[in-house]
Amino acid sequence: MNTSFKACLTAVASVLLSAVGFAADTVESLIAQAGNANDDRERQVVLEKLATHSSLDDTRRKETAALEEYVRRWNESGLKFYNASTRGKPDRAIGDYDFGVAADSPLRPICELYRGRMLAWNLIENSNVRTNPKEAKWFKDEAVASFRRVAEAFPKNTVARMYLGDALPWGTTPEKVEGAPEWAALQREQLERMAEIIRWWITHRQRANTGEFGGGWGDDCEMWRWWSSVLLGFEDPKIIAAQLKFSRSAVTRPQLKGGFNTEISDVEHAAEDTTDNLVPLMVLEPNSEKWTKWGLKMGDFMRDVWTGKNERGQLQFKSFYFSATETAPQQQRAFDVIANVGALHPALLAWQKTGDEKLGAQICAWLDTWVDATARAENGKPAGILPASIRWPDGAAAGAEGRWWEPVKPGGYMHSYYIWPSVITEITDALMLAHTMTGKESYLAPLRSMAAIRLKHLKNLPSETPTPGSEAWCGDLLAPRRNANSNTGGLVKTLARFKALTGTTEFDELLALEGSEFVIRTDAAGRQELEAALRESLGALRVNFPGFTSEVRSTDRCMRFVQFLAQDYAFDDYKGVMQPKHELLYRMVTGDKNAPRFPQMAVRWLTPPQDIAALVTEASATRFTAELFHFGKEPRELSAELRQLRPGSYKASLTVGGKPVKLADDRVKVEKGHFSKLPFTLPAQALTVLTIQPTP
């Protein structure tokens, strides 16, 4: 593993001196060409040629053939095919992968390129490795060592240098357009770069027969989350067709025949095959009764399999490991966890659409249990804080090994996913929905108590690190995370959704303190913060195209190559690096205030995501306002598909450069169960404001 470059050169010289019938530089040039190639298919072709070189002895020929076969599989097999050889072994076994190439072989530096990538993506993908400082450091250091050997042997290999921290610019920066607001120019370029990355995946990875992208169904199904600004915000036929192809294929697999996974797994993995396919299907095909009925069916599983009455007479999940037919019996898995709401996202959307009373009563009975547990101070949990888990069957707010905030003991499988605050805004969104559907104030109690604790923390920042599990610790972790596009922490996202839907000013003080990346404000300071966040995001998106595309080996981590370059091993905020803010783009263009896994979009712009920018500034149930800028030189025809306005009559108005412009038809009629479409013409290169409000 630690063969020096000098030893490799000595071995190369030995091969060259033994060459018969070829010029001495022929073998050398082939090895150099293979090592310096930045395209793996090109490398495969060169190795195929090298393998037929008549001067190679049997040993070197076998090594070349073995390496060529590995590279072929890298190009043509599943993205993590190499895991099969290390399955059942310690995580570090990936570092000893047998390429069939000796340590002193001149081909060894090429193997180091693949060893480094396997180590890097294992670190990026594996949460148990990533959150263990000792293991994370070993993986990072070993990967870097491999890439350094590659860079030393093959200085033209830009892929290895990218992993070592060299930023590789890609694409072009659009020319400035006079009159375009800064936010619009920044957003436009990011939308177009995101679309280019998505189209790369469709063109180069999507399989014609199944729609898969090579990372396995369980990882591929999560890709739509970072597609959301383009996929859900606009209308790109190629991208929409690709998503529909994948999701329709995914939900017809045998293990989902009954409507949910037939094999028991933890909820994050058991639910993703339904949630991460049904939700985009329900959004993209809203008139399909098939998907709505399937969403309603989640309520049947909840009633018949997943939940029961605990010893307090309350409804709760009996475990966070379950399938379509049973829950896990193990005591260490007998917890109702925050993330269990992930299995119910399709049901929540179906309830919101249909108002089904039976399903609503069931969901509310479960949420009542969480409201009650939040109010209690129990097992060290502060009153007013949602617990990480509720133990079955006694209904206590409790976790593993006496820690209320840890349903999984440290070092256990998926520990970092389930530890508090986990995906807390997914359950606070469910509480918000329950309030808007029923009008009951009780569902706001957890939001109010945690908002007060978060506000108290911001006003009185502790001088020392808070004790885990304490109120101060909770107040700190309720912060939205700048660099992690997830629902971990970030209570503010739910509060922003609630404000948008109801117009309440109750949480304004807290919302104002959390920053415009998460709460879009239209005042001067808010716009400056928003533009600063967009600049950071664009800086990350302008470099390292391979890190978003060809280098990715875990399709649920397409936006996370930068994680490998972080300066420490915590990865909470990716110290020293910035991740593209794809959720910010989604919030800007759709008017939603949170992540798309439980989408609450105000609008879809029925036009391609090119030469355009959109900023929704108001998106309540009765009013809508958006700023738009079209960068093209000719007027643009499009429609706004309005998704959040409650039934009624509305009037639309358009202003261009502050002056009213007459619409061909300014009437908007919203009927129950249907989305209205407003067609209009967007003028070229002028700031336009679209406003929709109730008819007097």
Q: Which residues fall in each region the model found?
A:
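Surface-exposed beta-strand/loop patches in extracellular or lumenal glycoproteins
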Residues: 631-648
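Bacterial N-terminal signal peptides
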Residues: 10-19
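Boundary at the C-terminal end of the N-terminal hydrophobic targeting segment
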Residues: 21-23
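Surface-exposed loop/edge segments in extracytoplasmic proteins
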Residues: 659-666
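Catalytic domains of carbohydrate-active enzymes that cleave complex glycans
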Residues: 26-633
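C-terminal beta-strand-rich structural cap/linker in extracellular carbohydrate-active enzymes
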Residues: 667-696
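Beta-strand signatures of extracellular beta-sandwich domains
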Residues: 651-653
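N-terminal secretory signal peptides that target proteins for export/translocation
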Residues: 1-6
